[in-house]
Amino acid sequence: MFGLRMPELLLILAIVVILFGASRLPALGAGLGQGIRSFKKAFGGEDEKPTASGNGSTPTQSSSDQGSKQA
């Protein structure tokens, strides 16, 4: 991997943490991921995949809704 070993990678990680701060790293990673996804989508390299947020396309009915329909 470009001739980088563990000590060099740890040094790069330490510099990134010092520059951006540990609290901003998740936001930077999320922004980078969204940018890569939109770039792939623009070139047709990736289809839209469902997210794990729990917002499924099929709505579920609660038991109280089912009970009122039977009565």
Swiss-Prot record:
Amino acid composition bias (Polar residues), ranges on this chain: 52-71
This protein's record includes keyword Transport: yes
Its membrane topology: Single-pass membrane protein
Gene3D superfamilies per UniProt: 1.20.5.3310
Location in the cell: Cell inner membrane
Major location (coarse): membrane
Ranges that cross the membrane: 9-29
Domain of life: Bacteria
Gene Ontology biological process terms from the UniProt entry: protein transport by the Tat complex
UniProt keywords, alphabetically: Cell inner membrane, Cell membrane, Membrane, Protein transport, Translocation, Transmembrane, Transmembrane helix, Transport
One GO term describing the cellular component: TAT protein transport complex
Annotated GO MF terms: protein transmembrane transporter activity
NCBIfam families on file: tatAE
Job description of the protein: Part of the twin-arginine translocation (Tat) system that transports large folded proteins containing a characteristic twin-arginine motif in their signal peptide across membranes. TatA could form the protein-conducting channel of the Tat system.
Subunit and partners: The Tat system comprises two distinct complexes: a TatABC complex, containing multiple copies of TatA, TatB and TatC subunits, and a separate TatA complex, containing only TatA subunits. Substrates initially bind to the TatABC complex, which probably triggers association of the separate TatA complex to form the active translocon.
Family label: Belongs to the TatA/E family.
Protein name as it appears in the record: Sec-independent protein translocase protein TatA
Species name: Anaeromyxobacter dehalogenans (strain 2CP-C)
Lineage, opening ranks: Bacteria, Pseudomonadati, Myxococcota, Myxococcia, Myxococcales
